[in-house]
Structures are given as C-alpha cells and as structure tokens.
From Swiss-Prot:
One of its GO terms (cellular component) is plasma membrane. InterPro entries: UPF0060 (IPR003844). NCBIfam families: PRK02237.1. This is UPF0060 membrane protein Rv2639c.
C-alpha cells in the first residue's frame, strides 16, 4: 500500500508541476496557448491521480501531497529551469517530506 501511494504521489506531482510549468511556459514565456492548454489538461490529470490514493480521506491525502509538491517543485526547477536550491530550500523540502511520512504512513491503530 505504501509503495502504491508513493507512486501515485510521484505521478500526481509530475502531472501538477508539469501542468503548471506548461501554463507558465505558454503565458509567461510566450510559447503560446497550446502549451497552456496542455498544462490545463495535465492539471486535470493530477486531480484524477489524487483520487486513486489508498487513503479515503481527502484532507489527509491533499495535505500530504502538499509536501510532495514542495519537494517536487524544487526538483523540477533543478531539472528543467537550471534552479539551484540553497540549503534552506533543501531543509524545508526535507521537513515537508517528513511531514508527508507522518501524515500518510504513521500507524493509526485502526
């Protein structure tokens, strides 16, 4: 269940961050409405991936995903935009990922 959940978080991050990046490229970098439109579609795919999480609680899944989004956005920026995070970015992302682990995978006794 944990492996499936992690895979779904990764897929959601690629769809959401990629979608937002495509919209950014289409509008801010003036690459055109096709890029922005593809981004909107990818953002919709992100929403679908969130519904496939094994945990049934919307608030928990989306709260935990927020941490994945933080770390994933920094990684995306490094891979595609030449962004270099400083130590505070890294510390913050690690803290977010620790929060993801607690929120999603801590034993709850039920």
């Amino acid at each position: 269940m944990v492996v499936r959940s992690i895979l779904l978080f990764v897929l959601a991050a690629v769809a959401e961050i990629g979608g937002a990046w495509l919209v950014w490229q289409g509008v801010r970098e003036q690459r055109g409405w096709l890029w922005a439109g593809l981004g909107v579609i990818a953002l919709g795919v992100y929403g679908f991936f969130a519904t496939l999480q094994p945990d049934a609680h919307f608030g928990r899944v989306l709260a935990a995903y927020g941490g994945v989004f933080v770390a994933g956005s920094l990684a995306w920026g490094m891979a595609l935009d030449g962004f270099r995070p400083d130590r505070w970015d890294v510390i913050g992302a690690l803290g977010c990922m620790a929060g993801v682990a607690v929120i999603m995978y801590a034993p709850r006794g039920h």
